[in-house]
Swiss-Prot record, chain A:
Domain notes: The Q motif is unique to and characteristic of the DEAD box family of RNA helicases and controls ATP binding and hydrolysis.
Protein name according to UniProt: ATP-dependent RNA helicase DBP8
Function: ATP-binding RNA helicase involved in 40S ribosomal subunit biogenesis and is required for the normal formation of 18S rRNAs through pre-rRNA processing at A0, A1 and A2 sites. Required for vegetative growth.
EC number in record: 3.6.4.13
Curated annotation (Swiss-Prot), chain B:
Name assigned to this protein: Pre-rRNA-processing protein ESF2
Keyword RNA-binding: yes
Annotated region described as Disordered, given as residue ranges: 1-68, 234-286
Residue stretches of biased makeup (Acidic residues): 7-19, 36-58
Gene this chain is encoded by: ESF2
């Protein structure tokens, strides 16, 4: 059989068949290494490039173990973003559809009551973001979250970002209700080894448990990005970035390709979306100041190619697996070189070809140098779109469109809600401190 | 009060529904003022007049003798003065609540009992509210939340407010709206223009700002184009220089200007120290880590 590989790693027959039906035949390096060890019952820390199949590396052994002894609330997967949670849940459902699997998504921005009802039904797997799960742990009754005390698996996907200050409080709440650490299996997966993850892998062995299994593909070859990814840069002044972007998106080479544009701020994302929309580019956006319904819709629209350009903040930089993406544009250069790796990792997935383009302004030289050092590769200059073309075709048009969208945003009060929320939180904290 | 009508769209959105009503009101007024438009253009009403209306009286004027023209002028002047007066005399009432699903036409009919109603505006309920109502099995009809009505005579407006406020609509006993209690308030010293003034002003400011910004952006663009051309020129000069000198000596690239660079902040364990973000670990995070492995 062609897929004896997965079987030899110890996966159940039904799972191998399900994977086979999805044309997943050959296990990747991280899957080969991690699946047998996890099946043995060891804790695991896995580090591998973007798009190297980390999801299956923890899904396959969990599903195998679960099918041996099906029970409600078998495993919890924590992810940093809502969209990633939905994607993982989709994959779990797809793999386990033959076994009547029940997967619950517990993420922010959706009905709390609905989620509580779903938790009461004892789903087999819970895919959650820490904030909302913590809310349930704190506020729901015993019948809703009692099952969490018997969880067998805890997975932290994108562990490097989960193990930061941002999530620490919620994470602590979530972990507090789970069984003690030697009664469950902990799996950490990440594309970046941070101090925290390193510290965990060096942590002393807990009693009654085999030692932690640490696996890092990255250390084999020191290139952090996929080999099929082309990296280019374009030197451009700050205030004409939009014009260049528009020209590139409408240039012959890219007029039909799907692409993701990464920005650093939600405001920039909104400006760009409006500008490009008024210039008749099929565009959608994803950032934290959109209602959850719209966020989900826009990811689906992009997946279904109803929109060909997705403008996103770093909320989309991790984990999202959309195979059709051909070009990733770093409209703003991220401060953290590893963020670049994650962003660029949205394309060139699973051996496909992909391109990543950086817009470099006069202030970003240092950042780009840090990125080049990190990925161990020099970027080439982007030459497909020249200055003359931009000046002649898009400059005036785009600037007018940008100003108009700025005005419209001003009128509609973009960002007001967030400011209000911030003020509310601050005043709440103040009263909290006083009491 | 500005909050209630701060959104221009609200005004626009009602147009399909009560346009006829508004137009009938306008037409009535147009007839009154039709004659006094051609010469006193500065006195023109804010309402947009159609071209047709202007042409008709012109033809008439040609046929008249001079004396008659003089008379006509006098008459028009008089009319204009009286018209100004009527503008002064208008009164606006505010309705804090509109009976459920009542349409502007019906409301106009009710208010006309007290005197001639000129303009009427009802604010439609918000879209998501409507959707929610329909979703939970409610009526699909449009509901209006509040409204304003302009009476040609103040007297009528006051009468309307004092009579209708807090009372049922009445009429025939079987009427659908017979028992609905109205809430009408006369707004003293308030004109219809006050309602739209703020929105119009805001729009004007926005438009002016937009023009200003676009012109500024164009200046920046011109500068950019200039710079691109300059760089091309400089590059060519450098090339030709190189060719002439046959690389006899290294051309010194002097640094003309430096820019303040944005910060690099890495959290990776193996990153060089210059890029590392100093991150004091909090107790909470430590606890989590301990409870994990």
């Amino acid at each position: 059989m062609s897929n004896s590989e997965f079987k030899s790693l110890g996966c159940s027959k039904w799972l191998v068949e399900a994977l086979n039906a999805m044309k997943i035949v050959q296990p990747t390096a991280i899957q080969k290494a991690c699946i047998p060890e996890i099946l043995k019952g060891r804790d695991c820390i896995g580090g591998a490039n973007t798009g190297s199949g980390k999801t299956i590396a923890f899904a396959a052994p969990m599903l195998t173990k679960w099918s041996e002894d099906p029970q409600g609330m078998f495993g919890i997967v924590l992810t940093p973003t809502r969209e990633l949670a939905m994607q993982i849940a989709e994959q779990f459902t797809a793999f386990g559809s033959a076994m009547n699997i029940r997967v619950a998504i517990v993420v922010g921005g959706e009905s709390i009551v609905q989620q509580a009802i779903e938790l009461q039904k004892r789903p087999h797997f819970i895919i959650a973001t820490p904030g909302r799960l913590a809310h349930h742990v704190l506020n729901s009754g015993e019948d809703t979250i009692g099952g969490l005390k018997r969880v067998k698996f805890l997975v932290l996907d994108e562990a490097d970002i989960l193990l930061t200050e941002t999530f620490s409080k919620d994470l602590a709440t979530c972990v507090s209700i789970l069984p003690p650490k030697n009664k469950r299996q902990n799996l950490l997966f990440t594309a970046t080894m941070t101090d925290q993850v390193k510290a965990l892998s060096d942590a002393p062995q807990t009693e009654g448990k085999p030692p932690v299994f640490t696996f890092e593909v990255e250390s084999v070859d020191n290139v952090a990005i996929p080999k099929t990814l082309e990296t280019t840069y374009l030197l451009v002044p700050e205030h004409v970035k939009e014009s260049y972007l528009y020209q590139i998106l409408t240039s012959e080479k890219y007029v039909k390709s799907s692409c993701i544009i990464f920005v650093n701020r939600t405001v920039t994302a909104e400006i760009l979306r409006r500008t490009l929309k008024s210039l008749d580019v099929r565009v959608t956006s994803l950032h934290s100041q959109m209602p959850q319904q719209e966020r989900t819709n826009s990811v689906q629209r992009f997946r279904a190619q109803a929109a060909r350009v997705l403008i996103a903040t770093d909320v989309a930089s991790r984990g999202l697996d959309i195979p059709i993406v051909e070009l990733v544009v770093n409209y703003d250069i991220p401060g953290n070189p590893d963020t670049f790796i994650h962003r660029a990792g949205r394309t060139a997935r699973a051996g496909r070809h992909g391109e990543s383009l950086c817009f470099v302004t006069e202030k970003d030289i240092q950042r780009v140098e840090a990125i080049e050092e990190r990925i161990n590769k020099k970027m080439e200059e982007f030459t497909d779109v020249g200055d003359t073309a931009v000046i002649r075709k898009s400059l005036t048009k785009v600037t007018a469109a940008k100003r108009e969208s700025l005005m419209a945003m001003d009128k509609e009060g973009f960002g007001e809600r967030r400011k209000l929320q911030k003020r509310k939180n601050e005043s709440k904290e103040k009263t909290h401190r006083r009491t | 009060m500005s909050k209630e009508y701060s959104d221009v769209d609200d005004f626009a959105s009602d147009e399909e529904e009560d346009n006829q009503v508004l137009i009938t009101g306008k037409d009535a007024k147009k007839n009154v003022i039709q004659f006094d438009q051609e010469e006193d253009e500065e006195e023109q009403e804010e309402e947009d007049e159609e071209v047709q209306d202007e042409e008709e009286p012109e033809d008439k004027v040609v046929q008249l003798t001079e004396q008659q023209i003089e008379k006509e002028k006098q008459r028009r002047l008089k009319k204009l003065k009286s018209d100004k007066k009527t503008k002064h005399k208008t009164g606006v009432v505010y309705l804090s609540r509109v009976p459920p699903y009542m349409k502007p036409a019906k409301l106009r009919q009710i208010l006309t009992r007290f005197g001639e109603v000129d303009r009427l505006f009802l604010k439609r309920e918000e879209e998501h509210k409507h959707q929610q109502r329909v979703k939970s099995g409610g009526n699909k009809k449009t509901m209006f939340e509040e409204g304003w009505a302009e009476f040609i005579r103040k007297k009528d407006a006051k009468l309307c407010a004092s009579t209708l406020n807090g009372n049922i609509i009445g009429g025939k006993k079987g009427n659908f709206y017979h028992d609905d209690v109205m809430n009408v308030k006369y707004l003293p010293g308030f004109k219809w223009a006050d309602l739209t003034e703020q929105i119009a002003r805001e729009n004007d400011i926005r438009q002016a700002k937009l023009q200003l910004e676009i012109s500024q952006a164009n200046k920046l663009n011109a500068e950019f184009i200039h710079n691109v051309e300059k760089s091309k020129m400089v590059n060519k000069m450098k090339q030709s220089k190189k060719r002439n000198q046959q690389e006899s000596q290294q051309v010194d690239e002097e640094v003309r200007r430096t820019f303040k660079q944005r910060k690099v902040a890495s959290t990776r364990a193996s990153a060089p120290d210059s890029q590392r973000q100093s991150q004091p670990q909090s107790k909470a995070l430590n606890d989590v880590m301990h409870s994990l492995f």
